[in-house]
Amino acid sequence: MRRVMWPLACAMALCGPAAAVPARAPDLSTTDAVLRWINGYRAKPDVARVPAAVRTLSQLGALRDSETSAVYVGFVAGIIGSYPQLAGELIEKILPIKAEDHWLIVRAVAYSGLPNWRDVLNRFASRMPSRQLMIEKYTTGKLPTLDAIAFEASPTPLDKLKGYTASVGDFFTGHKTPEPVRLEATSEVLDTLWGYYFATGSYGPVERILHMLPWSKDRQDTDKLTVGSMAKFTLASNAARVRRKSTVPGRLATSWRSSARRPSCGLLGLSSDE
């Protein structure tokens, strides 16, 4: 939890309202320029420029650290998931990035939500030889996808029944049922969810971020406190945009707005009014 959500913070701080994105071809020559473009993508989707943006990030060395690159992973995952018919073409055009950055393609496909994401990864496995093991781990379930985020909650009666049934089965078979692989809700995952939201404008990522809000009051777990506070801050910074997004259900929009507090927006000079 030592890192700062720098890419995500920059994406918010460097941009004005999404509606202000200019009509001319965007500048994608620097990391800051790409962040601005990602932040305004929902106002004017331009999927054809996504590969160029990723190639720029790779050339500038912005993809070396998986933690600080999480917002890019989420963005590419959201794009691939939104355009299943173009997935192969998009990946083809992103592949020329540095071989050491191919991890981003693998994770983005695994996080995309495509029904056939495993087939897509296997199709391109030979083109990413240094990521064969990573691909194998994702496709066999040894690494979690974005759908496997772990949110602790009190077990329901059905959960308890399933647990009891599994325990009885383990007793008679002598084999312990393996626990499903879960994705811990960290600040890296938070960045990834925001990247997915920037690409799609869908409320699914926001709903998951809202699940992290209670952690902002957890004084017993420093990691959760950090993630919860980051979730609260980023939600507050984006609260004004909810009024312009019809894809966010009323109950989520209300929760999102209620998370906005003026003191939180003072960090990094951000304003919830935009």
Name each model-derived stretch.
Residues 7-15:
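Bacterial N-terminal signal peptides
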